[in-house]
Amino acid sequence: MDSALQEQGSMFQSAGDNSMKIWKMISFAILSLVSLGIIFIFEIKDWPAGSSIAGIVLGFSLPAFWHSIQDLSDTTNWKVSQRKLRRGRFISNETIIRISFAYLYRIKVGNKYLLVKNERGTKKYQPVGGVYKLKGNEKIELKNLYHIKDDNKVSIDESSCNDYRLRIESKYLRKFVKRFDKKAERERVDDLSREFMEELIEKGIVNWDQITYRFCGRHMTNLYFGKHFQIYELLLADIVELLPTVEQENDLRQLMTQHSDLYHFATAEEIISLGVNTETGELEELIGDHTKKTIQEYEGQLMKTRDFGKTYTVELHT
């Protein structure tokens, strides 16, 4: 399959991309009109060979014109990848897509990032954070609107039954994402305290009453076939950066001097290599591969949504 359809960070389409799409649409429109004109003239002149050639050209240009109109609505790379998969008949409108929408914290002190152990699954170290939670009657609304199904790849219990890990038919995916951004009753970026408290406060790693963080942007994969779960997937991760006070930064530096299996500090290079060090012979992956989405080196690849750059202060209550 085209490598462009594999899992990659997705950005809004640039102005240059949109200009190219517009020029393609105009070009195919002109070519189609010219072909129609030639067919009309040649039919009047009773020159069947000329009208036949123009008909062949029209058979190419008219579908291309329609495709170019469709392409204008593909404003992000994940939409482009979905369109390519449809046109290539890799997926249909009824193809089930697995979605996982999450938020992740960048907690950096000096040149190292604070990671916590994934105790439920891989046991690898990863950023503080997790999947968004549905609230109120949102899950019922999503069932009524888009016939969503529970994720069948990760076990569901009382703590995960309202997670934004779901399955949905491809034809509903765009409306689903639009609702997630605008109308959905769910956890919002102005209060992402829940996972912070569960993974750092309740475990006694830090003891803070309040935090401030900045919204860095959104990482969104292309629509791709996940080898691990053997299903087409769309993954979203909103990235926020902790803005520690002087006292909180001192607490983090103190943590760096202590050893614990609950957390780990890693440099950007260690995160990119997943903790593998060929020089020392440490070949086991210690760090989750999604962790790199949070490091500063990747911030330029994040989508700048409407919350980009905003800061939020939240109280931490256990």
Residue ranges and their predicted role:
Residues 2-318:
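N-terminal leader/linker segments that precede catalytic domains of diphosphate-processing enzymes
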